[in-house]
Design a protein with these regions (language model features):
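Short, charged recognition helix plus adjacent turn
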Residues: 1-6, 62, 69-91
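Short alpha-helical DNA-recognition segment
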Residues: 23-47
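Short, basic-rich loop-to-helix N-cap that marks the start of a DNA-contacting helix
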Residues: 47-62, 78
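A short, Lys/Arg-rich alpha-helix, primarily the initiator
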Residues: 1-23
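Residues within the helices of the helix-turn-helix
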Residues: 17-18, 29, 58
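The alpha-helix within a helix-turn-helix
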Residues: 20, 32, 61
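Alpha-helix N-cap/N′ positions at the starts of helices
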Residues: 11-12, 37, 52
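Residues in the helix-turn-helix
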Residues: 41, 51, 70
Length: 91
């Protein structure tokens, strides 16, 4: 990725990438497909160059239990306990 590109949504992208790589262990193609999206759209969210869409966030909430507060704000209180603990214990 070109580091000179602005990444205004890098905080959101960090949480998405963590969940995809560390929790569900999928590549971008598989993860995007699992929530009904194509990889190019998902890739922009994870790159931090485009904001996660509401439809994308709702799909992630439905499929994986990720709370809106967690995805957009990093507030982990509403996550299922196993996800919350994993997020808090990450290195």
């Amino acid at each position: 990725m070109d580091d000179s590109k602005p990444r205004p949504y890098s905080d959101i992208s960090e949480r998405l990438k963590w969940h995809r790589e560390q929790i569900v262990e999928m590549n971008q193609e598989e993860y995007a497909k699992s929530i009904g999206f194509k990889r190019p759209a998902y890739s922009l969210w994870e790159a931090g160059t485009h904001r996660l869409s509401l439809d994308g966030a709702l799909a992630l909430r439905t499929k994986y239990g990720l709370s809106m507060d967690f995805m957009y704000e990093g507030i982990d209180d509403a996550l299922p306990m196993t996800l919350r603990n994993a997020w808090r214990e990450r290195s």
